[in-house]
């Protein structure tokens, strides 16, 4: 069931977590929703397909911000919100084959996306009302896309892929619904069910800073109209010959992180917090039960060097 009152034991637990952070000089940055949906919200409302979930999210945000605003200065609304394009249920709690309104996959996805962006804006507004000194941001899985060749159509595909990433940022950072997906929506017969009140909320609920995870870059290859999203996860048929790959086929691209930082700062001019970057590797313990993690050390060093270069470029990076 969906409770009317919060779980005090759970709230008290995070009081202790934040107190412990401050004890050691750690400034917490808190993600409000990180892929952890109450089962009842998924079963009864199909996650963010329902606008009732927006109201529940508002209630949740008010609860935690009022409780922790003296302990938490930095808030993120959702984790990797754009992953809803590729893993809808994980990101939004909405299952594609359980639409309450019988929507097809494309329509459901973008209705859910709109509801999440609306919920994000409402969360930012609440943070500003309750704790004017606090900052509220957004977070996406940031991808750098390279055209597969110098063929002009591949660059068109690159722009399309990047715009599907920027769509989330443009709404959350600029407070406007961009034009560039209009043609795609028309081709896919996707209807935008936005009210004037929705548009006004998006304008008011703009993020103070932006944040992202970065794990790899990807290759854009044109395959005809209507264009298809290259995606966020790797495609083994489009490996970059200039980059090494992980055992799972993810490109290792430290320079891509510098590119990502410059792209975002040029477009939005907002401070940036890098929420995640890392690598998966096969590891084994030696006879002393130790893991000599030199590969990961080198990976992190290479990416930190590129963050430093981006800062020299003039990008305002305030945390990693």
Predicted region positions:
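Interfacial juxtamembrane loops and adjacent helix segments
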Residues: 7-8
